[in-house]
């Protein structure tokens, strides 16, 4: 290693410690083998949690604790340099998890392998914490007063403290007090789930991706897929895309439109005949009503159809206007017919 200082050059004459050379060599091999390197926060992480994760994640990759400077040396050896965004993140108390698994899947795996630990003052209860009835390993002493402070009924039996009945000492979301933490430790309850605090992932040696960009909100994506499914179905119905689901909805609608069009054009078929007869009867009754009003000497009587609810009798003077409007109405144009037929196919 040479360091330029003005016109002088510093040349390292002493060899690097064998331990550091070995660490750099191992890191180099891991970087060559695994495309993804997760960084996780070591601050406040107990050795028990770290060793437990090493054991649980051994099928998915390798957890290594490497000094940032040594990791950067190994990274430069493998990739020929280190991007500024990666160099900025590789500093302080960080650990490394080398893996070939999809980063989004790794986040899920880490969460599923959370490690239980004893509660500490300031922790939040993840659920209602219940101290079960039965014996404890604690001998009578000052600890009994702390049981009493938490309103846990106790008795002394066989030289040990016994819990008289199941007692809730902390509700979900409640902050753990020093008394709660000590009592839970005495009775052997570890209510807190701790996991590696992932910071992000080095993506194939090219860039650093923050953990917030990798967390997938399952419910959000479920809603997006459901919305997309509704839009896709509506589009398929509008363009009459021939699938089983679309045809099951389109064919009955097309049949109804075809029958309505045939009835409007006066085409006689088994389906249109009831509608044509009803329309003919209605038109005949309307015409008879007009004639009866203008020529009462003919003795024409018109029987109007009975309805479920009484309605006002239409004024005779309005019938000629309606008849006149009916006569002025023309049949559908060729463009309307063509448009209706096109909508069916």
From Swiss-Prot:
Q: Does the keyword rRNA-binding apply?
A: yes
Q: Does the keyword Ribosomal protein apply?
A: yes
Q: Where is the composition biased (Low complexity)?
A: 305-318
Stretches of Basic and acidic residues bias are at 319-332
Q: Which GO terms describe its biological process?
A: cytoplasmic translation
- Location of the region described as Disordered in the Swiss-Prot/TrEMBL record: 303-345
- Per the record, the domain of life is Archaea
> What keyword terms does UniProt attach to this protein?
Ribonucleoprotein, Ribosomal protein, RNA-binding, rRNA-binding
Q: Which SUPFAM superfamilies match?
A: Ribosomal protein L10-like
Q: Name one GO cellular component term.
A: cytosolic large ribosomal subunit
Which molecular-function annotation in GO is an example for this chain?
A: structural constituent of ribosome
Which Pfam family, any one of them, does this sequence belong to? Ribosomal_L10
**Family of this protein:** Belongs to the universal ribosomal protein uL10 family.
What PANTHER family would the database entry show?
60S ACIDIC RIBOSOMAL PROTEIN P0 (PTHR45699), LARGE RIBOSOMAL SUBUNIT PROTEIN UL10 (PTHR45699:SF3)
Q: How does it assemble?
A: Part of the 50S ribosomal subunit. Forms part of the ribosomal stalk which helps the ribosome interact with GTP-bound translation factors. Forms a heptameric L10(L12)2(L12)2(L12)2 complex, where L10 forms an elongated spine to which the L12 dimers bind in a sequential fashion.
The record's function comment reads: Forms part of the ribosomal stalk, playing a central role in the interaction of the ribosome with GTP-bound translation factors.
Q: What is this protein called?
A: Large ribosomal subunit protein uL10
Task: Give the species this sequence originates from.
Answer: Pyrobaculum aerophilum (strain ATCC 51768 / DSM 7523 / JCM 9630 / CIP 104966 / NBRC 100827 / IM2)
